[in-house]
Curated annotation (Swiss-Prot):
UniProt-recorded Gene Ontology molecular function terms: ATP binding; ATP hydrolysis activity; ATP-dependent protein folding chaperone; unfolded protein binding
Gene: hscA
Function: Chaperone involved in the maturation of iron-sulfur cluster-containing proteins. Has a low intrinsic ATPase activity which is markedly stimulated by HscB. Involved in the maturation of IscU.
GO BP: any one term: iron-sulfur cluster assembly
Keyword flag Ribosomal protein: no
Record SUPFAM superfamilies: Actin-like ATPase domain (SSF53067), Heat shock protein 70kD (HSP70), C-terminal subdomain (SSF100934), Heat shock protein 70kD (HSP70), peptide-binding domain (SSF100920)
Species: Escherichia coli O17:K52:H18 (strain UMN026 / ExPEC)
InterPro entries per the UniProt record, alphabetical: ATPase_NBD, Heat_shock_70_CS, HscA_NBD, HSP70_C_sf, HSP70_peptide-bd_sf, Hsp_70_fam, ISC_FeS_clus_asmbl_HscA
PROSITE patterns reported in the protein's UniProt record: HSP70_1 (PS00297), HSP70_2 (PS00329), HSP70_3 (PS01036)
Keyword Phosphoprotein on entry: no
Protein name as catalogued: Chaperone protein HscA
Name of one Pfam family that matches: HSP70
Amino acid sequence: MALLQISEPGLSAAPHQRRLAAGIDLGTTNSLVATVRSGQAETLADHEGRHLLPSVVHYQQQGHSVGYDARTNAALDTANTISSVKRLMGRSLADIQQRYPHLPYQFQASENGLPMIETAAGLLNPVRVSADILKALAARATEALAGELDGVVITVPAYFDDAQRQGTKDAARLAGLHVLRLLNEPTAAAIAYGLDSGQEGVIAVYDLGGGTFDISILRLSRGVFEVLATGGDSALGGDDFDHLLADYIREQAGIPDRSDNRVQRELLDAAIAAKIALSDADSVTVNVAGWQGEISREQFNELIAPLVKRTLLACRRVLKDAGVEADEVMEVVMVGGSTRVPLVRERVGEFFGRPPLTSIDPDKVVAIGAAIQADILVGNKPDSEMLLLDVIPLSLGLETMGGLVEKVIPRNTTIPVARAQDFTTFKDGQTAMSIHVMQGERELVQDCRSLARFALRGIPALPAGGAHIRVTFQVDADGLLSVTAMEKSTGVEASIQVKPSYGLTDSEIASMIKDSMSYAEQDVKARMLAEQKVEAARVLESLHGALAADAALLSTAERQVIDDAAAHLSEVAQGDDVDAIEQAIKNVDKQTQDFAARRMDQSVRRALKGHSVDEV
C-alpha cells in the first residue's frame, strides 16, 4: 500500500498519459537537467553529448550565451561573463563584497541594498542570471522530450535560507517554469540511491560541489526518507580548491597578485585542469603565462587538507545533532564533482569507517533524484511508496515579555509543518499585541535573529490574561515560513510571510548552534532571571491596580506593610539575584493574602446584592 500519493492540483495524470517533468540541479559550477523515461532516470545531454552545463552566462549588448560558449569568453571578457552566480543568490551587496572581494565584476546596489551586476546587457541581478541558466536547461529538456514541461523540481543546498530559496523560485518563474517543489540537494541524492538499493538504515550524504558543502544524516525506513539533521558551509566547495591551487601556481610562477583579469582567468583555468588531472595522476605539468612547472598530488593535498578537515568537523557536528554515531552510518553517499578528489574520498572513508558510495556519477546523482521526485509530483507515479521529509535548520519562535524567546518549532523538525501555541495579554485592557518572529537557539532575543514583526489589533479589552491569542507557524515544503496570530474569542487575525531580503549563511547557522551549546548554562540562568523579573512586574502591576481600586479595605498599618513589601520587590527586581527576586515575590503574596480575601468577599457581596438565597 502506498504511504503517500503526491501530485500538483490538476496535474494527476490520466491512465496511459504521461506528463513531462524534469529535475534540475542548479549548481554553482555546473548544472544538469534529468528526466524519467521508460522507468529510468537519466540526465539529458546537449547536441555534442555533454551532460553538464557550465553555470556561466556571457552577456553582450545584443544577447547572451550560456554554458560552454559562455565559458570560452571568460578569459577574453571577464567583466561580462558571470559564473558561480549561485553564491550571490539572496545576499546583500555588502555581504558579497566582504566575502568575495576579488570578483571580477562591477556591482551597483539596488534601492534595497541588493546586488546589481554591470554588464553589456545592462544591470542584472543574480535572479536574472540564474533564470538564463534555467532557460537553457529547459530548452534542452523540451527538445529532448519533444514537448513542453508540465513541471520541474529544482534542487538547492540544504542550508539555503528563505531569501535564497525564494530567489531560486523567482528565477524559475522568470524562466517560464512551473516549480513543483524545491528539493534539498542531499535529499535528492538519497532518493536516487534509496530507490536503487532498497535498503533501510542511516545514511550520510556528503555533498561537496563547486560552491557549497552540505552534510545530511538521513534515516531510510519502509520507504520513508527522514532527514535527521543537516549542516555544512555555503561558502566552501571545489571553487575554493581551484583558487588555492591558482594562488599556489601564481606564487610559483612569480605572477603579480594584481595582474589583469585575463591572466587571473588563465591561472584559474590552469588550476582547474591540474586538479582534474591529479585525480588520476601523481603529478601534472602546468603551463601558464609563459611559466612551466610540475605540481604533485602531494602538494595539492597539502593545500586543500585544511578545507577537507573543515568538512569533517561539520560532519561531526551534524552526527551529534542527529544523535547518531559514525559507526551507525550504513552508507556514505558522495555527491558533487569535488568528491572525485582522492584526498576527499580517503578522509571521508576514514572518518566514517567505510568506503563511500560512488556508483552513481556524483555530478549527476542530484539531478537524477530530482527527476525521480518530479516524476512523482507531476502525477506519473500514483503508487509511489516514497515519503520525503526535510528539516528546518534553526528553531523558530516568538519574543515574550522580558526579552525571552519562546520556541514554537524546534530546529531539525521535519517539514512541511504547522505548529500553534497560545499566548495571552500582559496588561489589563490590552487591545493590541506585537508579534516578533525569532530564529535561533539561544534563550534571549538579543542573542537570536529577528525575522519579522507584525501587530494583532482588535483584541477585546479584558483583564490581563483574559484574552487568548493563538499563534500558528507554518513552514511549507520549500522551507518558507508564514506566521498567523488570531484572537480566539473574536476571530480577529493578522499574518505575515517571512521572505527576508537576504539571510544567514550556513556557517553563521552553524555558529549560532555552537553558541547555543557553549552558552547553554549561562542562557538558562539568564532566562530564569528574566522570567522572575517578568513575574515581579506582573505582580506589581496587579497589586497597584488592586490598591487603586480597593485601598479602603486596608488599615494604615496594613497598607504600610504591603507598600514596604512592594517597594522591596521593586528594588530587588532591578538586580540580578534570582533567589532574592523569588523570595520578594513570595513575601508580597504572603502580605497580600488577607487583602485578596477581602476583595473576593466584597466582590461576592456585590454580586449577591439584591438577590435572595433561592435565586442563588
